[in-house]
Each structure stands twice: as structure tokens, then as C-alpha cells.
Amino acid sequence: KHTKVLIIGSGPAGYTAAVYAARAMLNPILVHGMEPGGQLTTTTDVENYPGFAKVIQGPWLMDQMKDQAKAVGTEMIEDHISSVNFKSKPFEAIGESGKKYTADSIIISTGAQARWLNLESEKKFRGFGVSACATCDGFFFKEKTVAVVGGGNAAVEEAMFLTKFASKVKLIHRRDKLRAEKMLQKKLMDNKKIEIIWDSVVEEIIGDDDPKNVKGLKIKNVKNNKTSDLKIDGLFIAIGHDPATKLFKDQLKMDNEGYLITKPDSTETNVPGIFAAGDVKDKIFRQAVTAAGMGCMAALEAEKYLAG
């Protein structure tokens, strides 16, 4: 299948790119996996997407974006891209289905996944007191006690952000010192609402089934192997994200964490005609609205590129 614009990945970035590309009469094809919509499909309440005064649901918002992209003329294909060749034109992408897609330009919006602890109890309470995004969900924990797992910049920033809402924040770290930058560490130590629990890991999340909510944690001290219970109302996992870029390893420039590198103030990668939008290239903001904005930029830049 040949197209002027091939969009790999859905979510706010992919769908917005599709809307703009379709309205520019570029007849885009968007290839998405089994469960399209990206990370927003795993969150429940969304309160920070512009244009909605009432709380909306993440999956609903993604369905709306998908329907909008379809309505303006995007062709959606369910397939999993397993290999690409960006070294010659037209660009090539091969799906697990065996289908071959060729394109004059490509927008990559494959996103990222939060790293999880991989506990059964974590899966159970994800979206019901367990989250990987303080910016998204901190607001729901006004005057409550929450815990954050991690020891890097992200964990420290999440912990400090959560003190705006929570009455107490416990930062759980498996080592005896943090990896975060010194400046951040100082701010953290100065914050009276934050308590650090060193040398510890979360073994289990404890809570109720009906309605689903988190009540506490079982934590283990890795030095003496003692377990203890901790009463909390919410848990935030901040141990990093993994961008979905393995596919592009020898084709596109990435940073040491695997995020695609784009030119300043642009979504263009080091290969002209290949653009990247959303969490696949953004490790700073990671919001639906910024991803959508980048999707728009990528489509406009692709249009300009195709016009020569």
C-alpha cells in the first residue's frame, strides 16, 4: 500500500496528525496496534484536556479523536509494524500481517509506556489509586497520604508536586541515596510534608474490591529483609518511561534513553521526511495536549516537505 503520509501509532499525537494530514488532502494511512489510543486509554478521569468543563474519560477522548480522524478521511489499519527501512525512498514499513506499506513521508507517534513494578496487585489497582502520572491524578488526593516509588528526577518532582494536594507524601526508594540532581534533592529534604523511606521496595498494594481503592502497602527493607505495612491512599510509580522506538534503532537518531531526536522547534528527525510527535520524542511534558500539538506540527511539516 502506498501513501503520501503514513502515521505509525495512535494516541493524541497520531490522531491529531491524521486530522491535519487528511484535511490537507494527503489521504493519510494510520497504522495502530490491537488497543489504539495510547496511554490515555489506561487512565480514567481526565480533567486537564482543554475544552471540557466536566470530567471526561481517557478512553472516550481517544475514541472521539479516532472518530474525528476517520471522519475527515484517514484510513485506519490495525497492524503491528515489525520492521522499517528509511534508508531509501519511498520509505518502507512492514507489518506483522506481512503487509508492506510505502510512503513519501512518515509520522512516528508510537508513544511511550510508563515502567511499572509488575505486581499483580498493581495491575488490579491501576487507575484506582495507582498511577504513573502525578500531573494527571494528584488532584484526586487532596488532604490524603500518598506514596511515590523511585529515586530519580521524575520521582522527586512527582513527590514535590503531590505536596500541593496530599497532606503527606512518602517517597520509597530501594537504595540509600537518590539519583536525582542535588538541587532537587535539597528542595525535597526541605519539604516538611515529605518523608523518605530508604532501602525499601513495594511488595504488595493492599485495598478494597468494591469500590476499588488503595488502603496501604506492604514494603520490604532490602537490607534486613523485614516487611512492614504502610497506610496510604494512593501510590505513584515514578521509575521512568520507555519510548517505543526499538523498531527505529539503526534508522533514526535517538538519545541514550531511546527517545527520538528532532530538530529544534520542529518534529523532523535526522532523516528528512520522517517526523516524530508525542511521547516518543518528549520526555519532559508527556501530556495529551502537548502530544496533540506535536501531531499537528508533524502533519504541517510533512505537508510542507511533500510540497517541496
At which residue positions do the language-model features occur?
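Phosphate-coordination loops involved in phosphoryl transfer and adenosine-cofactor binding
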Residues: 2-4, 78, 142-144, 199, ...
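Residues that mark the start of a beta-strand
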Residues: 4, 27, 129, 144-145
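A Rossmann-like FAD-binding core segment of flavoenzymes
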Residues: 69-95, 100-103, 164-264, 304-308
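Glycine/small-residue-rich loop that forms an oxyanion/phosphate-binding "nest" at active or ligand-binding sites
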Residues: 76-96, 100-139
